[in-house]
Amino acid sequence: MKKNLNQKLINLIEYYNLINANFLLSNTPLKRNINNVTTSFGGTKLQKLKKLKKSIQLIENCELKKNATNLVFGDGNISAKIMIIGEGPGAQEDAESKPFVGRAGKLLDKMLESIHLNRTKVYISNVVNYRPPANRRPTEEEIVRYLPYLKNHIEIMNPKILILLGSTALNAIIGNVTVISKARGKWIQKEIGTVKPWIIASFHPAFLMRQPEQKKLAWIDLKMVRDKIKNLKI
């Protein structure tokens, strides 16, 4: 009993360290800029990812978690230098506890194959780790709550290339600077905690399924990724 209690206390301390207890207890309204909410986990990359996943599992008073079936953390090669960020899990992802496994995921796989990539060469995650009810877009508050975990996820992975799929991922990482149609297809370098990957935004596969005429622009973005891979010798 004492051992279990001690472990719960350790888990709770790790959780508060991650989200910053002062941030949680403050009466100040939520702010958009939370770049200072970071955590450093020790150990190997795999150990760090496991600790991060555990911290997300410890989240409380979250409607996303309450209504979801499973935590959807990440998928792919943890040694990959290419990381892809989507919006949030759908029904199939929630059921299988894996990102991009539904129809949009199948399209993403085809998009990756077109530039000679697959899930053994990339790592995939989402802005939020639990499925929003009815597949709705995550709210601003939900994005703000999960953003420290996402940024720490990116820090641990330390990708050379970061691909943001859709406006939710774009606005979470870059900020509300513009719409995805204007921001896509441009390379920028941005510090995310201790790492500074090359970042490009493109359309989310789910959007491309609704607007197939935009696939020609997505193909331009994919070719830019292919060229950057060659230039960086990944």
Per-region residue spans from a language model:
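Short, small/acidic-rich helices and loops at N termini and domain boundaries
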Residues: 1-3
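A polyanion-binding, active-site-adjacent surface
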Residues: 7-11, 15-18, 22-234
